[in-house]
Amino acid sequence: MASVELSADVPISPQDTWDHVSELSELGEWLVIHEGWRSELPDQLGEGVQIVGVARAMGMRNRVTWRVTKWDPPHEVAMTGSGKGGTKYGVTLTVRPTKGGSALGLRLELGGRALFGPLGSAAARAVKGDVEKSLKQFAELYG
């Protein structure tokens, strides 16, 4: 599985950062791989909640069934996803306080049969670019 984990400092409080991170309707505004939801968003999130969305990775769109695997407000939310063709996704968002506001951590994982061999290293590079761009967009949008 190709995975990258990076963080960025944002000049807003940890609670404000969490409020944006946990607002699923805002996810497409800053998370590069997220194109939109195809199911109703739940009124309340928690472990085990499932949501259907569309993800874009390496230029390919895929319908993904996401499941919340960790829900620890206001610190961490993690989701795993399964898409068509055996693709696997993982997204973990963390928020921690810093002296100047908060740090947003983003771990993005991409895997499945299609990503073995040379395509796997290309996927790792693409995932790193997506994580960097997502963190930058979050900071620009909300910071």
UniProtKB/Swiss-Prot annotation:
Cellular-component GO terms for this entry: plasma membrane
InterPro entries: Polyketide_cyclase/dehydratase, START-like_dom_sf
CDD domains in UniProt: SRPBCC
Pfam families named among the record's database cross-references: Polyketide_cyc2
Disulfide bonds: none
Protein name per the record: Uncharacterized protein Rv1546
Origin organism lineage: Bacteria, Bacillati, Actinomycetota, Actinomycetes, Mycobacteriales
